[in-house]
Amino acid sequence: VITMLESQKDITHKGGTMRLGAYDAHLTQGSLVHSLYKKETVSERHRHRYEVNPAYHEILHKNGYIISGISPDGTLVEFCELPRDVHPFFVGTQAHPEFTSRPTRPSPLFSGFVQAVLSRASLSSSELLAS
């Protein structure tokens, strides 16, 4: 389900070929990620050379996978998630939000995850398994 960035497929020596730095992502309205960032477009830092294979975007979508953030040119998945009725907090990102998080200003993804955990902290084991 992953593939190399198209621009790197023919490169045999990978040194210096990562996708590095800050990149914008357009967020899907109504998504968990959009509700956490409270913005239409966000910029996050990256450090990778792989991506979600575009050949699987439609198949993943048909099976409930939400592409909740995409590059401005519409080609790269930046954020993805499962619906909240399937999982209380299932978010993936190509970005590295830990690069910009600070003790007094955590990434919206981290603070959202902590909030999701705290909201379920009082549930019993059987309630957690049933939900």
PLM regions: where:
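Amide-donor transfer/coupling interface in amidating biosynthetic enzymes
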Residues: V1-S131
